Amino acid sequence: MIIRNTMIHDAIHPEPFQGDIVILSGKLISVGGKAAEADEEILDASGLNAYPGFVDAHSHIGLDNYGGPTGTTFDYNEMNDICCPQLRGYDSYYAHDAAIPMGLAGGVTTVAAGPGSANVLGGTFFAVKLYGNTVDENMIREAIGMKCAFGENPKRCYRDKSDSARMTTAAKLREMLYDARDYMMRKEAAGDDLSKCPKYDMKMEALIPVLKREIPLKAHAHRSDDIMTAIRIAQEFNVRITIEHCTEGHLIVNELKKAGVPVAVGPTLTNASKLELLNKSWETPGILAAAGLQVSIITDAPVIPQQYLPLCAGLAVKAGMDPFQALQAITINPARHIGVEDRVGSLEAGKDADIVLVNGDPMVSDADIRYVIVDGKKLVERA
């Protein structure tokens, strides 16, 4: 396929440029310039803007069972075990969830989805394209992060069981990481001698990739003290971490800069449903981006329906965020945040052909998405 005469916003260069896009076997072959005549499908995109498929770094789409009674159909929280790192989010993903085509129609082509925040350790997130009949068909990575949670949610969900204070949450996470480190060391020391190897433990095995820095802790943290606790524990164990939600990040900008952690801000298009959300602001992503942090904007779908991801970026621009940084916050930055930037997040040769063609600016509410192309296939087409 050749997309002709489009204005290209590649999410790498601040200024858009006119040109053609050549797609072959689901990949971007060239971006920009004048493509030679070829016996290929031609899509005349004159007057349209081309953007990378939007990426949402944090959601529960496919695990929520859209349209079901609240609290009875969701599959993203295990409510009987406060630490369950052995869970894999993709085992709860329903590829025919009604919310998935809605998100795709809004230009969102790749998401990170996985467990909620009821648990101190909830299991692994995965990255997937928003189409297909099964999760296996279009999974990009099976494990992009280990979900952990701080603040009100673990306290609320386990208050009568085992967790009624923030310091308890922190202690439980430390205990699991200490145990996993000990398990890993004993396993490595045993080598090929099975008689010395510790008994197989799914929970401990699940944390080894975290301790080896292969995947980050994906830390749910709204309040500034919770954010700092998450960073403190990550530094104690020398593990990677991303901050999810980062609601009070604007209150600790210097500390976040010093830590150098990627942050995902949202969901902001909601009411302050709990005390730790009182300081949420559309100014936060812009403040953090201006300070040099890698910022993603997230929906936390179903909290905000996935199709409103570009609208959220637009509201951040309205509150002062640089428009190019806002575009990056829903494209290349979330791709980096979840470790799939080699495949998606920008319009560059060699990457997956995930493209949104828009009549206007997708961050403005009256923009009209005409085509959504994923892996070189036109999955959404509007006259």
Predicted regions located by residue number:
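Active-site core of metal-dependent hydrolases
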Residues: 72, 89, 184-281, 296, ...
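N-terminal metal-binding scaffold of metallo-dependent hydrolase/deaminase domains
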Residues: 1-39, 48-50, 361, 377
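C-terminal cap of metal-dependent C-N hydrolases
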Residues: 4-10, 336, 348-383
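Active-site gating loops and adjacent loop-to-helix segments of metal-dependent hydrolytic enzymes
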Residues: 68-93, 134, 149-154, 196-197, ...
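Polyanionic/metal-chelating signatures
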Residues: 104-228, 232-241
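His/Asp/Glu-enriched, well-ordered alpha-helical/loop segment
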Residues: 66-67, 71-80, 84-86, 216, ...
